[in-house]
Each structure stands twice: as C-alpha cells, then as structure tokens.
Amino acid sequence: MRRGLGVCYYPEQWPKSRWKDDVLNMKNLGISFVRIAEFSWAMIEPKPKEYNFNLIDEIIDIIGKNDLKVVLGTPTAAPPSWMIELYPDMLPINQSGLARQFGSRRHYCFSHEKFVEHCEALVRVMAKHFGENPYLAAWQIDNEYGCHDTTISYSSLALAGYRKWLKKRFSN
C-alpha cells in the first residue's frame, strides 16, 4: 500500500456544489487519502433496512476521479435515531445509573444484541456495495473506540453480557 497524507472529510455536512472544489483543493495540497462516512449511518440507512448509498457513491467517484484514494469508515459509532426509538434499552448507563442520551456518538451499550445485529447487517451491505470499488484503499472499522469514556455501561444488558462471557470463558 502506498503511503501518503490523509484527511477526514464529511461531505454530508457540505453542499454538493462544494465537493469538487474541496477535493481539488485536497489534491493540490498533496493529500493522498480521504476518510469518509464514519458518522453517516443515519444518511446511509434512514429507516431500518432501507439503504441509500447515493451520496457516498457520488463523493467516492469525485475523490477517485481526482486520483485520490478513499478510506471508507463503517459508521457504527453513530447509530441513527430510529434505532434508539426501536430499542430505548440500547442506551448505555453510566456509573450514576443515568442513560447516555442520543445526539453524540457512542450512545449505545455494546452488549445490546440488536445493536450488534444492525451493525453486522450494515457492514455486510456496505461490503457488498463498495467492496469492488477501485477507488477504495482501505476500510476503517468503527471509529474512536473507547473515546469520551463511552465503552463502559452499567446496564443490566452489559451485566448479563459479561456473565455470559464469563460462563463461556471459565467453565466452573
């Protein structure tokens, strides 16, 4: 794999009319890699099992046609609001017993089976859709794991998951 300088880019935060100029500026500055999509789950899957990759396809095409490569993030760090509406028990619980609220990233309990199922489904669909794209240089699996004190949950789901893991790990 070639080496080079990379940037993070969030095309969903900018008007499409700006994308080509932004990518051209990246190219002129010597950028080689552009990381995208790590927080775009709500855009990619606005409703359960309804996937729309149009914006991601479009920006990947612009990036690639300007001789830059894409690092594609799996957006599992930021589940969409519909998921919290379907599974309100998915919110992690802090040490004081309060639920982390929707609106940032990592607003889920890692032990929630439905969260894991939705992550797996999303990543499989993304792999099928983007897997052969010649402009992709790499995949970024998840994003900022452990940031902002978000990996620990004191929820009953986390406790049950931990006990299940212990039983698998230790037979006695």
Task: List the model feature ranges, each with a label.
Residues 65-67, 79-172:
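Active-site region of glycoside hydrolase catalytic domains
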Residues 8, 35, 73-74, 138-140:
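Short beta-strand segments
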Residues 4-16, 37-55, 99-120, 145:
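The substrate-binding groove and active-site-proximal loops of carbohydrate-active enzymes
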